[in-house]
Amino acid sequence: MRLTPRALCSAAQAAWRENFPLCGRDVARWFPGHMAKGLKKMQSSLKLVDCIIEVHDARIPLSGRNPLFQETLGLKPHLLVLNKMDLADLTEQQKIMQHLEGEGLKNVIFTNCVKDENVKQIIPMVTELIGRSHRYHRKENLEYCIMVIGVPNVGKSSLINSLRRQHLRKGKATRVGGEPGITRAVMSKIQVSERPLMFLLDTPGVLAPRIESVETGLKLALCGTVLDHLVGEETMADYLLYTLNKHQRFGYVQHYGLGSACDNVERVLKSVAVKLGKTQKVKVLTGTGNVNIIQPNYPAAARDFLQTFRRGLLGSVMLDLDVLRGHPPAETLP
């Protein structure tokens, strides 16, 4: 989403921050290490699996994937599904594909599982991958079993439901949520196709025990892979504002009816709070007694800013643009 020429000219003259303060952020606290159990369950189910579908958010195609997936599940045929393509700026999609191919990922597809975009291509791709593999200990089995993996809240359950709509004309088989942690355990097999006979195993989202950088952690948080309060809604809103301005994505100005683009998160959230009526009464002690004043509810405004971004109402965004252009994520952890 772009500004009018006049507003864009004003925005271009603004002095955007060149970097975001990352020192002292406690990333370990954002990503609690209770997910190892889920990974162990996946490993124990591998002997039943013919292929692995890894689902990830298309807004962060080059960062935030769990490296343990490749290490522990890497012997099986693998398809990377970059979901939520409708929310991602895919202007440089070809470069993204080339970058991933350089990492050894040749089987990649972009999808929008809510609207079933490109989902019909998945089963033929998986069938071809399985056909080229040895299917250790499973040659006598006529049905295909696929494990769906990924970090939390990238659309694994949405993918399963979309495949069922496309190939079985059936409704939901697995619950979908807008926050991480909806799928709690490795579930029983869910049928998604008759010909070929194919079942999927839904799995809980599993984050890496160690995130590569603070900035990668913030990107994952913006995409909803952790509960917002663990990172802090206002911190996330500030990083979102910094990112939108840096990449000249000024849809927030139009959406909230702001006079111009702004790099001060307090001012932006104040305007959002006033526009949406998100204010609160606060008692202030003065020399003449208590006085009630109306203040903006900054946390509520930050939550709205984040949710509006996640619904795509601020325009499509590519959070990995810097990585794509050869700049490593900031504050890489030792």
Curated annotation (Swiss-Prot):
Cellular component terms per the entry's GO annotation: mitochondrial inner membrane; mitochondrial matrix; mitochondrial ribosome; mitochondrion; nucleoplasm
Residue ranges of domain CP-type G in the record: 36-209
Q: Which PROSITE patterns match?
A: G_CP
Q: Where does GTP bind?
A: N83, K84, M85, D86, N153, V154, G155, K156, S157, S158, G205
UniProt-listed Gene3D superfamilies: 1.10.1580.10, P-loop containing nucleotide triphosphate hydrolases (3.40.50.300)
Q: Which domain of life is it from?
A: Eukaryota
Q: Which UniProt keywords apply?
A: GTP-binding, Membrane, Mitochondrion, Mitochondrion inner membrane, Nucleotide-binding, Transit peptide, Translation regulation
Q: Does the keyword Electron transport apply?
A: no
Instruction: Give the location in the cell.
Output: Mitochondrion inner membrane
Q: Name one GO biological process term.
A: mitochondrial large ribosomal subunit assembly
What the entry lists under PANTHER family is as follows:
MITOCHONDRIAL RIBOSOME-ASSOCIATED GTPASE 1
Assembly and partners are described as: Associates with the mitochondrial ribosome large subunit; the association occurs in a GTP-dependent manner.
| Functional note | Plays a role in the regulation of the mitochondrial ribosome assembly and of translational activity. Displays mitochondrial GTPase activity.
Similarity remark = Belongs to the TRAFAC class YlqF/YawG GTPase family. MTG1 subfamily.
Q: What is this protein called?
A: Mitochondrial ribosome-associated GTPase 1
Taxonomic lineage = Eukaryota, Metazoa, Chordata, Craniata, Vertebrata
